């Protein structure tokens, strides 16, 4: 009897670690004005995810100066030769292994109806490694529509498993981003992997314990597998 219980415990632990390893999310973002950085901060207050910021290799560039001359030049170079690595601006090296993640959420600004050039560089270099992974897209812009950015993403990550909806956060609704992100996560069924609508807790919030069906427990749980503050634990 003891050996059976021990074997069951080991199997549960292996399942737990396997689930955590295969269901990880990476949020990749580039931010020039700071809007995308704010979006990522709000997003990661609602989900458990690692974060990777894309940085240009050359610092201090003013992409909007002289009538957006530099930004336009970078995008035109990509348009002219989209399959040539030399067409893309250099970015800082990244130390993330995409094999560790099941889901990639890309947060990028829109530049003149296209994806920001620096994010295009990252996806040109690593988009092939996203094949078969869940891919989400959050786009920040002043007012323009996002179809060009979506097209750029699908060109650079052709074999990603895209969520059913993309999220567009513009100047007029940026302050309402928390509600928009929460609704988007629901629309794409992001939380179905755990069956829990929301488990991320702030440091000031009391601990919440759920069973595996997503039900909040109001009493001290008995022995078993539960989720506390977004993480599985065994009591």
What positions do the PLM features span?
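Positively charged n-region of N-terminal signal peptides that target proteins for export
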Residues: 1-6, 235
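Sec-dependent N-terminal signal peptides
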Residues: 6-15
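Glycine-rich phosphate/pyrophosphate-binding loop and the adjoining helix
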Residues: 14, 162-193
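N-terminal beta1-alpha1-beta2 submodule of the flavodoxin-like/Rossmannoid cofactor-binding fold
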Residues: 21-106, 115, 182, 186
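Short, conserved loop/helix-junction motifs that constitute active-site signature segments
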Residues: 45, 98-99, 124-132, 156-159
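Short, glycine-/small-residue-rich phosphate/pyrophosphate-handling segment
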Residues: 131, 136-169
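Residue-level detector of functionally pivotal "anchor" positions at catalytic/ligand-binding pockets or at interdomain
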Residues: 191-213
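C-terminal tail/sorting-segment detector
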Residues: 225-235
